[in-house]
Amino acid sequence: MDYVSDDFAPSNILSCNDDSGDHPRNLIPELCRQFYANGWVTGTGGGISIKYNDQIFIAPSGVQKERIQPDDLFVQNLNGEDVIIPKPEKKLSKSQCTPIFMCSFTERNAGAVIHVHSQEVVKLCLLNPENEVKITGLEMIKGIYNEKKGKFYDNDEELIIPIIENSKYEKDLVDTFKIALKKYPSTSAVLVRNHGMYVWGSNWKTPKTQLEGYEYLFKIAIFKKIPPV
């Protein structure tokens, strides 16, 4: 295991001195700033992980997401073993979401996973005592990927997103998360009641755009459920 060096190239396993905006070292901090501006990762909440060259880049836990720097990230292999960690003086810890991230990578072959503490998700779950949310008839459904069919939904199809119950610790969500993945093979997201949402895709662009689509759909779903004053 190595520490991050000043040029972000601490080993010959993976060159991290890539200036490309799409490199996880640069991309994760940028996306976290965008998500913070949208109100999805405030108060140190939320997280993101991206697979790159068979290695997993993970944002740190318990930090202000809008202030994450490229050398704050953790890198581990597909077996969950740390390969590169931030320098000790930073006193950072790996995201508590890591077990769910890894579950998405192994169970769904995801390329990226995003976790947000969206107020819209929490509101929608409060309005839905059931263990799923059903949405129909909206154009933005076409922006959501059906993992079972391997294509995006049509706007006349029913979109079903599972809800699992929250737990004291993120790692304790893994079992119910796996059950939801098996029960809902079409889903690209899981809602956690009173908590937030996990969304994933084959690359970083897919969960980002789907997250935006889900937020839109959830706002409309909430509007339809709340009776007019």
From Swiss-Prot:
E.C. designation(s): 4.2.1.109
Gene Ontology cellular component annotations, sorted alphabetically: cytoplasm
Cofactor(s) this protein requires: Zn(2+)
UniProt keyword list: Amino-acid biosynthesis, Cytoplasm, Lyase, Metal-binding, Methionine biosynthesis, Zinc
Q: What is its main location?
A: cytoplasm
> Which GO-annotated molecular functions does the record name?
methylthioribulose 1-phosphate dehydratase activity; zinc ion binding
Which residues act catalytically here? 139 (proton donor/acceptor)
Query: What Gene3D superfamilies does the record tag this protein with?
Result: Class II aldolase/adducin N-terminal domain (3.40.225.10)
Q: Where does substrate bind?
A: 97
PANTHER family attached to this UniProt entry: METHYLTHIORIBULOSE-1-PHOSPHATE DEHYDRATASE (PTHR10640:SF7)
Q: What function does the entry list?
A: Catalyzes the dehydration of methylthioribulose-1-phosphate (MTRu-1-P) into 2,3-diketo-5-methylthiopentyl-1-phosphate (DK-MTP-1-P).
Record-given protein name: Probable methylthioribulose-1-phosphate dehydratase
